[in-house]
Every structure is written in structure tokens, then in C-alpha cells.
């Protein structure tokens, strides 16, 4: 049997999608028990840049790409799957994921968001929430990751937001 710690990390993008009011998009997963919420994320296909992957994943998971990349978190952030998921999740080929995170500004209408375009859908509900309120949700095994990440992503959004809000409303 393969030692799980020798498995590689899957390259992945994470999307911190903010609306013009500074609220963060989160969605409830359909494949995990216990009302687990997260930001959109997904794998990077071979030959694809992280930026292209982020927009593609957004379109696949929430039905719209109507957003602008405002900032990119420096570096990659890796996490291990819980031991009971290694060998099962992610096709059983990865020990976890290494993520490049993007801060995006949502330029569409709420009615553009569609969770029913995948079969089966990855999410069944979504909300715009204050970034710090995300940490009060059930984030499953990603709780520690989000505790580290959310303050940094919110700060990146705040740094880019003034110019984006002004130009996106013009």
C-alpha cells in the first residue's frame, strides 16, 4: 500500500469572490455531510494558467464568469486531506491540494448565479456574507485553512476595492 505522505498535492485554485458591498460569496457543498460551506475552488488542468483555471472553475461551479481578478495571493497554500479521505477523494491520487488564491470582484447580478449547471451540482445554496462571518460556518476540515486565509484575502480585497467599485459602477 502506498504511504499517503508520498502522494503529491493537486494543483488547485481558490476564489474569494466579493460583491460591491464587500461581502464574500460562500456556497454549501452537496457531497459532504453536516452543512459544509466554502468558497469556489477547483483543479488546474494541464497547460492551464491559474488565472484561466479560476475563471473556468467559477463558471463551472456557480454558472457565471462575470468577475474581475483584483488581486492574487502571493505563494501557494497547501493542505492535507483528512486521513479517512486520502485514497478516496480527488481520485485517490493526491494527499491534498496546493492552492493559488485569487480575490475577484463580482460584476454580475445575483440572478446570474446558477448552481444547477453541473450534474451533480457541487453546491445547493449560496450567500454573500461578511468575510469574518465565514469562520462561524461549518467549514469542515478546511477550518484552519480559512482561519489563516480569510483575513489576508479580505485585506487584499480592501486594498483593491476602491478603484474597482468606482470603475465597475461607471
From Swiss-Prot:
Alphabetic keyword roster: Hydrolase
Keyword flag Hydrolase: yes
Matches recorded under PANTHER family: NUDIX HYDROLASE 25, UDP/ADP-SUGAR PYROPHOSPHATASE
Gene Ontology terms for molecular function: bis(5'-adenosyl)-pentaphosphatase activity; guanosine-3',5'-bis(diphosphate) 3'-diphosphatase activity
Record InterPro entries: Nudix_hydrolase, NUDIX_hydrolase-like_dom_sf, NUDIX_hydrolase_CS, NUDIX_hydrolase_dom, RppH
Stated name of the protein: RNA pyrophosphohydrolase
Enzyme class: hydrolase
Amino acid at each position: 500500500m502506498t504511504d499517503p505522505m508520498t502522494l503529491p498535492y493537486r494543483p488547485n485554485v481558490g476564489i474569494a469572490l466579493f460583491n460591491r458591498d464587500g461581502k464574500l460569496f460562500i456556497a454549501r457543498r452537496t457531497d459532504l455531510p453536516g452543512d459544509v460551506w466554502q468558497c469556489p475552488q477547483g483543479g488546474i488542468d494541464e497547460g492551464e494558467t491559474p488565472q484561466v483555471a479560476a475563471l473556468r472553475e467559477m463558471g463551472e461551479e456557480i454558472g457565471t464568469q462575470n468577475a474581475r481578478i483584483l488581486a492574487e495571493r502571493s505563494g501557494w497554500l497547501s493542505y492535507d486531506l483528512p486521513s479517512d479521505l486520502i485514497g478516496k477523494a480527488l481520485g485517490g491520487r493526491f494527499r491534498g491540494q496546493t492552492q493559488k488564491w485569487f480575490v475577484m470582484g463580482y460584476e454580475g447580478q445575483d440572478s446570474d448565479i446558477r448552481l444547477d449547471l453541473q450534474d451533480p451540482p457541487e453546491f445547493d445554496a449560496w450567500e454573500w456574507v461578511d468575510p469574518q462571518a465565514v469562520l462561524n460556518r461549518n467549514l469542515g476540515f478546511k477550518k484552519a485553512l480559512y482561519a489563516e486565509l480569510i483575513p489576508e484575502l479580505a485585506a487584499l480585497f480592501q486594498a483593491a476595492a476602491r478603484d474597482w467599485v468606482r470603475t465597475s459602477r461607471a
